[in-house]
Every structure is written in structure tokens, then in C-alpha cells.
């Protein structure tokens, strides 16, 4: 972790990398402000403000969409477009980060050099990552149904279900925690393998993740806590700040620009952390 801290401090001298990540993060925050926050607010409204009902209604909505071939085709088209955008953006940004952490000399048009070398591979990997992420999230939502149903019954007055509720909730939380942790770690370490090896990217990334698994779990857990707390604050502000009037400027400033600054720093730290761990693994296996 000390090596990661040193790399983050050194990055302050590379304004080009910070600007590249800031540009990408601004696009993400714009989508988050105009699409993700309204959707989250809408989902909670569907369930009448009840969190458990919102989960069940969301699952029903998703399964309804998946039963329509037209929506599946729309979804695949959207995933393809998103993968191509990620292929362009990530191939350039990650190439710059990988070169920086590998202490390689900075070259002109480094971003576009990364796009030229890795666009196709990163696009294909991004398509798979996005598609697998959607399917995995749907599967995990379905996994929660028994626990949600039993918990609703318990909260509805069936106190005899206390032991069963605690058991199902604990098992479900453990499955969700380790399921998402394994999935995200393996997906994240797929990317640095592309920039450091010639083939077998997923296998190498998985091997790297397995080598430092518990160290990575602790690292990701810290990121999760920071990210979730910050998102909860933003979601709360989104629900209470007016969209018009004198305080509308404060809403835009907090939900867009403060969010943008914090997320830029967050994504840079996460990327450096993942690539630093992977490069430590590379040194270990290539000695």
C-alpha cells in the first residue's frame, strides 16, 4: 500500500493523466446527474418508498424487459456502443497510467498511441465486462428474492419468522458480498493484463488477483465504503435540493462539480491501485 501512496503522490506532476481522467469522469457525472439519480429516485417511488418493495418491483421490471426480444436487441446495441466508448477512453487512459507506473518515458500523443495499440482488445473486453456485469447483477437481484420475501413477512407482523429471517438475511448478505467482490476483482484485473502481456489476459489477470486476493479485498472494501457513503450523501441531496429557484445553483454545484472533483480523484486512486498491484505481480512472475 505504501507503493500505491507513493505513485499517487508522483501522479501530481502528470497533469495530462489527471486531465484525461477528469474529462472521462465529467462525462460519467453528467450521466449520473441526468439519468442515474432520477432513475434511483423513480425506483424508490415505484415501491412507495419501501426499500424491500422497491427491490421486488425492480426485479419484476427487469424480468419483464428481458422477456421482450425488442428490448434485448436494444440492450445489446447499447452495450456495444458503451463498449466502443470504453474501448476508446480506457485504452488511452490505461495506457498512460501503465506507462507512468512502469517508469517509461512519456511520449507525445501517448493517449492516441494507446488507442491505436489497444482499442480493439479493450472494446471486446469491455463488451464482455458490461454484458457479464448486467447479467451478474440481475442474477444477484434474483438471489435476494427469498430473503426479501421472508423479511417482508417478518416486518409485516409474523414474528415467528425471526430466526429464519436472520438466517436468510445473513446468508444472502454473504453471497452478495463475496459474489460481487470476486466478480469485480476479476473483471478489474482483466484490463492491466492487456497492457502487460500478449495473450491469455483473463487467465493472467485472475492469477494476479488470486495471488493478492485478500489484500485486494481489503483495498476494495475501503473504496466501497468511501464510494457508498459519498453516493448516499449525493442521493439524499438529490432528493431534498430544489430543481429550480435560488438553491438550484447549489444543487448543480454539489451534484455535478463537487461530485466531479471527488469522483475524478476516486477513479484515479482506484486505477493506480489496481495497476500497481498488477505490476507488482508482473515483477514477481517475470524475475
PLM segments and residue spans:
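Nonpolar helix-loop interface/hinge motif
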Residues: 1-41, 105-112, 173-247, 251, ...
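Low-complexity, intrinsically disordered, cysteine-poor segments enriched in small/polar
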Residues: 3, 7-10, 54, 58-61, ...
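Membrane-helix interface motif
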Residues: 35-50, 138-155, 232-243
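Short, highly charged, low-complexity non-transmembrane loops/tails of multi-pass membrane proteins
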Residues: 49-52, 281-287
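Selective recognition of hydrophobic, aromatic-rich stretches within alpha-helical transmembrane segments
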Residues: 70-102, 140-148, 159-199, 249-283
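Alpha-helical membrane-spanning segments of integral membrane proteins, especially the hydrophobic core
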Residues: 71, 75, 107-137, 161-176
Amino acid at each position: 500500500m505504501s507503493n500505491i501512496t507513493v505513485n499517487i503522490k508522483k501522479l501530481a506532476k502528470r497533469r495530462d493523466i489527471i486531465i484525461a481522467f477528469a474529462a472521462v469522469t465529467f462525462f460519467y457525472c453528467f450521466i449520473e446527474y441526468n439519468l442515474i439519480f432520477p432513475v434511483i429516485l423513480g425506483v424508490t417511488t415505484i415501491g412507495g418508498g419501501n426499500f424491500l418493495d422497491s427491490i421486488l418491483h425492480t426485479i419484476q421490471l427487469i424480468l419483464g424487459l428481458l422477456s421482450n426480444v425488442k428490448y434485448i436487441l436494444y440492450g445489446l446495441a447499447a452495450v456495444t456502443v458503451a463498449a466502443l466508448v470504453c474501448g476508446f477512453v480506457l485504452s488511452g487512459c490505461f495506457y498512460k497510467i501503465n506507462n507512468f507506473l512502469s517508469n517509461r518515458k512519456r511520449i507525445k500523443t501517448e493517449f492516441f498511441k494507446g488507442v491505436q495499440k489497444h482499442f480493439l482488445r479493450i472494446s471486446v473486453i469491455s463488451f464482455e465486462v458490461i454484458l457479464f456485469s448486467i447479467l451478474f447483477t440481475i442474477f444477484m437481484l434474483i438471489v435476494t428474492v427469498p430473503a426479501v420475501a421472508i423479511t417482508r413477512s417478518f416486518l409485516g407482523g409474523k414474528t415467528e419468522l425471526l430466526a429464519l429471517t436472520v438466517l436468510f438475511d445473513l446468508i444472502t448478505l454473504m453471497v452478495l458480498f463475496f459474489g460481487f467482490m470476486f466478480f469485480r476483482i476479476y473483471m478489474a484485473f482483466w484490463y492491466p493484463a492487456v497492457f502487460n502481456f500478449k495473450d491469455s489476459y483473463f487467465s493472467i489477470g485472475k492469477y494476479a488477483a488470486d495471488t493478492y486476493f485478500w489484500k485486494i479485498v481489503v483495498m476494495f472494501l475501503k473504496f466501497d465504503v468511501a464510494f457508498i457513503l459519498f453516493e448516499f450523501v449525493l442521493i439524499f441531496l438529490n432528493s431534498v435540493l430544489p430543481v429550480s429557484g435560488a438553491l438550484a445553483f447549489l444543487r448543480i454545484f454539489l451534484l455535478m462539480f463537487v461530485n466531479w472533483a471527488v469522483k475524478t480523484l476516486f477513479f484515479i486512486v482506484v486505477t493506480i491501485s489496481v495497476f500497481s498491484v498488477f505490476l507488482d505481480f508482473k515483477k514477481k512472475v517475470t524475475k
